[in-house]
A protein has these predicted regions:
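Short acidic-glycine-tyrosine-enriched beta hairpin
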Residues: 71-87
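Short beta->alpha connector loops
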Residues: 39-42, 64, 89
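Short, conserved beta-strand element in jelly-roll/cupin
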Residues: 50-66
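Residue-level recognition of conserved beta-strand positions in structured domain cores
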Residues: 35, 61, 68-70, 95, ...
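A short, N-terminal "cap"/entry segment at the start of jelly-roll beta-barrel domains
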Residues: 1-48
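Ligand-binding loop in jelly-roll beta-barrel domains
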Residues: 78, 87-110
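Short strand-connecting beta-turns/loops that link adjacent beta-strands
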Residues: 30, 71, 98-100
Length: 110
């Protein structure tokens, strides 16, 4: 793993921001581990996200809802809930908790 070998997942998180915060905690050619902090954000209307790699996400604090385009499946994630999003799967974040920050841990793998 590159550079950041230790730390605290909850460190350096401001009370609120207008934009989501993305911080890569560790990475190599096959793996990226990322902390995402949402402050009530959602994916813009009519926008679908599609990652080149598999993405496993867990909500550590807060809550969110994901929606998948092809299956129309919706998944509400509360603290401790996780989901695997296969590579090239169109999905979107419908909402994140409006009054509490939502802290995600995302693992992107080849």
């Amino acid at each position: 793993m590159a550079d950041r070998r230790s730390g605290n997942i909850y460190a350096k998180i401001p009370a609120a921001k207008k934009k989501e915060m993305f911080r890569t905690l560790a990475q190599n050619k096959n793996l990226r581990i990322e902390r995402i902090v949402s402050f009530g954000q959602a994916t813009p209307e009519n926008t679908w996200l599609k990652e080149r790699r598999d993405e496993w996400v867990i909500v550590l604090k807060g809550a969110a809802e994901l929606r998948f385009q092809k299956t129309r499946r919706r998944v509400i994630l509360k603290e401790g809930d996780y989901v695997l999003i296969p590579a090239n799967t169109p999905h979107r974040v419908e909402w994140t908790h409006p009054r509490r920050k939502t802290i995600w841990l995302a693992i992107h793998s080849a």
